[in-house]
């Protein structure tokens, strides 16, 4: 679990995000609601071939699960050794990548059998992960997003995320949608839509009130998890130990508030 110092930093960052934004802000409407296990401490999340793929965290509880959206039925599950705190996941061809918070190991699995096929190492912390057609994009809790070579996991380039002149840190779970990077901000109810070219925040999605406070397990049950169904243009969001996954539509943006 993140330290108390990190939590305080995240809360300060969330307050700054709420008060110092320059980009326009969108709201949402709920289209549908799907079941989600409150045992799942969501760190990675994507939709592919009609299924939800999820990477969960916490030492001794980290796993990869493949579930049926409508029922929440688990079709596959792979627990990882208890010394690892699982973080972001992404698909790449026939494989699935999962990296770890502070162990500096990225596991590569066969996506269909969840059998490990290789490992990569890296420096720094592992948080969120997504992909373009050619690169893997990662976050590490700072304001920097790194673009990596899928064949080596080495950094190719990076961008610093800013809203106006303000750096936006605590970048967490990621999703690449229609040429933009969507990023959860740890301990914030907002998602940033980020330009992959220069890192500027294009707009915000304010998801305040999506899950009532009395349905959250604890203070760490925060918004974290973005998935996109490209074929049907559907956007899904969830959070750590949330009882539901929400399909949402984004409303037109308004001026910053």
Regions found by a protein language model. Name each.
Residues 31-63, 78-90, 239-241:
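Beta-strand-rich domains and repeat architectures in extracellular enzymes and scaffolds
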Residues 23-39, 69-73:
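A short helix->beta-strand "capping" segment at the edge of beta-propeller domains
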Residues 71-109, 114-126:
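Blade-loop segments of beta-propeller domains
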Residues 53-58, 96-103, 138-142, 183-187, ...:
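Conserved beta-strand positions in repeat-built beta-propeller and related beta-rich domains
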Residues 67-72, 110-114, 150-153, 195-199, ...:
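Short loop/turn segments that connect beta-strands within beta-propeller blades
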Residues 38-49, 82-93, 122-135, 165-179, ...:
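Beta-rich, blade/repeat-based domains predominating
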Residues 106-164:
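Hydrophobic, well-structured mid-protein blocks that either form specific transmembrane helices
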Residues 32-34, 75, 79-82, 158-167, ...:
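Surface-exposed loop and turn segments in beta-propeller and other repeat-based domains
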